[in-house]
Amino acid sequence: MPPAVRQGMRTVGTLRVTRPSSYVLSSREFSVLNRPPPNYPGHIPLTTIERGALAVGSAIGSLLNPRRADLIAALGEATATPYFIYRLRDAMLSNPTGRRILRDRPRISSKTLSVEYLRSLPPNSVGRTYVSWLDREGVGPDTRETVRYIDDEECAYVMQRYRECHDFYHAVTGLPIVVEGEVSLKTFEFANTLLPMTGLSMFAVMRLKPEERERYWKLHLPWAVRSGLASKEVINVYWEEELERDVNELREKLGIEKPPDLREIRKMMRRQKKAAKAAREKFEN
């Protein structure tokens, strides 16, 4: 049984202590006897029950720990079928650039993108903005999980492409990888792609601090919905061909509105809290 499915079963199993038995999926229901053969290298076919357990377990696990990229990836794959990933694939097929991406099957990694080249580009270019965002956040292009649980081979590539382009969405919007930034970007992605995982990720707003939650409702949620719905489908961007373009020009082309700088907002709030604390201590003394 795939490790992610076992993780999902363990998470669901913990519900036994708080839920009636009718809510529990017994491990006896899980079987590999009806598992079809893989459709592509690395593919792990799942039975309906396994897919359901994977969806429930990964949803609970990723809510408890939003930094578990493997669980978020599993949730995305388990909930993308039978409709949503096909809708996204059809959106690519209906777009000339999307069709080229499906034909060429480009991959985004440190092997396909030269970091040195990106750093040599003009400061306001897409490529330089992307690599500067990677440097600032301390991440790289090789951190994305490989798709395993989507049955259709072409749709599996669509999910892989979405996953590998995620950091470009971060870079173009300027949103950091802190939970507040991820929730805001996932809201944008949900409005733009309709992938269920991006919508379910919005429940992580419950883990935000009160002031962060208020900021999300008042500032980033309206931005994400407005910009995600108004912009062109970002899955159809051939990022490898846009690296030298001015990033503001690309935002205008796609119809993406850049949100307020979340890192600067958080820094300003910390400075204000520090100053207020110092003022209180001075007054008390």
Curated annotation (Swiss-Prot):
Zn(2+) binds at residues 166-167, 170, 182. It is a peripheral membrane protein. HAMAP family: Coq4 (MF_03111). Residues 1-11 form a transit peptide. Component of a multi-subunit COQ enzyme complex, composed of at least COQ3, COQ4, COQ5, COQ6, COQ7 and COQ9. It comes from the Eukaryota. Transmembrane segments: none annotated. Pathway: Cofactor biosynthesis; ubiquinone biosynthesis. Lyase that catalyzes the C1-decarboxylation of 4-hydroxy-3-methoxy-5-(all-trans-polyprenyl)benzoic acid into 2-methoxy-6-(all-trans-polyprenyl)phenol during ubiquinone biosynthesis. Its EC number is 4.1.1.130. This is Ubiquinone biosynthesis protein COQ4, mitochondrial. GO terms for biological process: ubiquinone biosynthetic process. One of its GO terms (cellular component) is extrinsic component of mitochondrial inner membrane.
